[in-house]
């Protein structure tokens, strides 16, 4: 995922809204994220249409179930031709290994297996929430680093994490391990419901592999300009 452009989170309720948004980006080769709301509303057809538009896809369904179920789910997802899928690291090593096995079994001959990453802790999770609501006494950063090690041991390609945790993760895993980071905002944007946020430039400085950007692009007055502005900051180039 070297030189990956900002991944746009398509947090829309319908295909119609999604296509109206994407129609603005004529000539752009986009990497987009399809989450639960859009996929559950539109099904695999949304993926087919996005691929016809030339989009690379991160299918963000965060699978978390018993190993056998996750294996079967990933085997089906492997046939969709997406670039990136994920599971929850909290499902444990056996579940993550089963997810990888399912992807390998379901990827059509001659095609590249989708990259598989594990969600460590959601960017909406705070240390206080971890301790008071989830009754996890281990510090937030320690859980993220531990989950990252576990994901690598399970054969996964990387993790979803906060930018602030990436440098700590790279002290514990190999340099080619992917760190995909949501919670990206420009300095003058609102944080909304995410508490561990960062700018594209800060993400670049911390050496993350890819950034995921939603509202800063999708809710901008000029989404194309916002996308390019974020891209320039992410790449460290002048607009």
Curated annotation (Swiss-Prot):
Keywords from the named record: Decarboxylase, Lyase, Pyrimidine biosynthesis
Catalysed reactions, as listed in the record: orotidine 5'-phosphate + H(+) = UMP + CO2
Cellular component GO terms held in the UniProt record: cytosol
Keyword Lyase set for record: yes
Biological processes per GO annotation: 'de novo' pyrimidine nucleobase biosynthetic process; 'de novo' UMP biosynthetic process
Any GO MF annotation of the entry: orotidine-5'-phosphate decarboxylase activity
Active site: 62 (proton donor)
EC assignment: 4.1.1.23
Binding, substrate: 11, 33, 60-69, 123, 185, 194, 214-215
Pfam families, per database record: OMPdecase
Keyword Coiled coil: no
Superkingdom per UniProt: Bacteria
Recorded metabolic or biological pathway in which this protein acts: Pyrimidine metabolism; UMP biosynthesis via de novo pathway; UMP from orotate: step 2/2
PANTHER family hit by this protein: OROTIDINE 5'-PHOSPHATE DECARBOXYLASE
Biological function: Catalyzes the decarboxylation of orotidine 5'-monophosphate (OMP) to uridine 5'-monophosphate (UMP).
Subunit structure: Homodimer.
Matching HAMAP family: OMPdecase_type1_B (MF_01200_B)
Family label: Belongs to the OMP decarboxylase family. Type 1 subfamily.
Protein's recorded name: Orotidine 5'-phosphate decarboxylase
């Amino acid at each position: 995922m070297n030189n990956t452009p900002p991944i746009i989170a398509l947090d829309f309720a319908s295909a119609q809204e999604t296509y109206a948004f994407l129609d603005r980006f004529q000539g752009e080769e986009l990497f987009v994220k399809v989450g639960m709301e859009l996929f559950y509303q539109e099904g695999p057809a949304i993926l087919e249409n996005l691929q016809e538009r030339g989009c690379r896809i991160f299918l963000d369904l965060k699978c978390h179930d018993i190993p056998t179920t996750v294996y079967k789910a990933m085997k089906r997802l492997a046939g969709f031709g997406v670039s990136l899928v994920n599971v929850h690291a909290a499902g444990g090593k056996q579940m993550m290994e089963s997810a990888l096995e399912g992807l390998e079994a379901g990827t059509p001959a001659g095609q590249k297996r989708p990259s598989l990453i594990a969600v460590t802790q959601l960017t909406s999770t705070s240390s206080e929430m971890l301790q008071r609501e989830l009754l996890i006494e281990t510090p937030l950063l320690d859980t993220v680093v531990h989950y990252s090690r576990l994901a690598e041991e399970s054969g996964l390609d990387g993790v979803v994490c906060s930018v602030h945790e990436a440098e700590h993760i790279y002290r514990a895993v190999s340099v080619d391990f992917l760190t995909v980071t949501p919670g990206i905002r420009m300095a003058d944007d609102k944080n909304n419901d995410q508490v561990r946020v960062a700018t594209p430039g800060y993400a670049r400085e911390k050496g993350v592999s890819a950034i995921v950007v939603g509202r800063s692009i999708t809710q901008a007055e000029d989404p194309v300009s916002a996308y390019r502005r974020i891209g320039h900051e992410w790449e460290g180039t002048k607009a």
